[in-house]
């Protein structure tokens, strides 16, 4: 089964302290994602190129099928599977705090990539 890599750009709001944002992601956001079997997530910061100094959330899923289970295709309505909601609990306060640091998530221009080679 081919892995899926979800690429989500993160645009910080003006005046946000980057170290506080990074610490929030590490202590509050990443542990929630890592509770869900079949996925992991990484916070990346651009080092060179067009997005140097900007952030990206990389969500790695073990397969297309697992991605579709965790995040059922629902058109424009974002959500997660009921069993995932039960596993992670109420994450509304985390996303409310996230919105104090950055624009909405997932970003409207995200892309999921299916690995075609190792």
Question: Where are the model-predicted features located?
Answer:
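Mature, folded catalytic cores of secreted/periplasmic enzymes
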Residues: 1, 14, 30, 49-50
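Active-site-flanking beta-strand signature of metal-NTP-handling nucleotidyl enzymes
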Residues: 3-11
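Solvent-exposed, flexible loop/coil residues
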Residues: 8, 16, 105
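Short hydrophobic/aromatic beta-strand micro-patches
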Residues: 11, 58-60
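Short, surface-exposed ligand-recognition loops at beta-strand->loop->(often short) alpha-helix junctions
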Residues: 11-24
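An amphipathic, aromatic/His-enriched active-site/gating alpha helix that lines ligand/cofactor pockets
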Residues: 27-42, 50, 60-111, 115-118
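A short, glycine/Asx- and small/polar-enriched loop/turn
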Residues: 51-55
